[in-house]
Amino acid sequence: MKLMIASDLHGSAYYTQALLRRMEDEKPAKLVLLGDILYHGPRNALPRDYDTKKCAAMLNALEKAPLCVRGNCDGEVDQMVLDFPLLADFAAVFADGYTLYLTHGHHLDEASKAAAPGDIVLYGHTHVPAFEQKNGNYYVNPGSVSIPKEGSRHSYMLWENGVFTWKDVETGEIWRTERIEK
């Protein structure tokens, strides 16, 4: 199952539109959003073309609703303008024989406790792409669509058949690939 995974859009209409253009090209079975969808948060500068209403309208117009988890910048007011569930702190996806736990990252310890050995924990929050194995689990972060940190790219990630592929949201260029070993 091909999943398109992104995090930390933070209300950037420019980068949300770029992500949705990539989605047209990628044709995933599902778009997974790991939180911080509309609000930029008090610690972040305003992202390019900050327009929460436009961002919400683009996401609401999707033919298939994205699967989302709540980020630390997401709240009940955001849910009032989005037509798909946003307020779950955790979710799980079963794909290609793997269990993928979804969380934003500010509750990463709780998600780690729920994961069985060999499971994959997907998280955002740090705005920094990551792929690491610890305590028998994989921890994978797509980075940020709109406000990347530590010199990383504006990015999203694909999952298909045990492989994660990171891509630049503006160009679609592949810049990292990692395989899960069972």
Segments from the language model and where they lie:
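Core catalytic region of metal-dependent phosphoesterases/phosphodiesterases
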Residues: 2-95
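Catalytic phosphate/metal-binding cores of nucleic-acid and nucleotide-processing enzymes, i.e., regions
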Residues: 3, 17-21, 158-160, 170-182
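Conserved beta-sheet core of the metallophosphoesterase superfamily
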Residues: 84, 88, 96-101, 106-175
